[in-house]
C-alpha cells in the first residue's frame, strides 16, 4: 500500500491562513481527477501541471506561487514522477501482472474494497467491438473495463499509477504475440 510522501521545504512558506508550511505531502491523483483536470486545462500545460500539483499536495494556487523556485521544482518533479510511474514501480516485492495488486485500494460500486484485480486478455470479438467506439477515450474505457471487470466509475477511482500499469499491460495484450506471455523459465 502507498504511503503519502513528503518534501521538506528548504525555504518554508505560509499557508493562505498565515500558518507556517515546512513540509508538503503529496499523493497520487486518480485517473478521474487527472482526466477532469486535463479537460479543464486543455490548452495550457502550465495550468494543468499546477492544477495537478495542487490536487496532489493540497496546496492552493496562491500557496504554490509563494514557493521558491527550487522547492517548487522539487515538488513538481516528485508529483510528475508519481503521475508517470506504474504501480509495479512503486509496490515493494513481487508484482503479479496477471492479478495486479492495487497501489491504492478502491471502493467498488457495490461498496466492497478492491485491493487487486484479475486481468484477462481480450478476445478478437472484444477488440472488434472496441474498434466500433467513436473515439480513443471510449475505446480505452471499453477495453479496460472488458479486461478487468471494472466499471467506468471504478476505473476513474484508480490511482494514476494503477491506471498506468493497466494501460501498459493492455498495450501488451493488443500488440504482442502469444510467445511474449509464456512464463520465463
State where each predicted segment sits.
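Charged interaction scaffolds used for protein-protein
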Residues: 1-43, 55-57, 61-132, 153, ...
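Mixed-charge, glycine-accented linear interaction segment located at domain edges/termini
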Residues: 136-154
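A detector of tandemly repeated sequence units and domain arrays
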Residues: 51-52
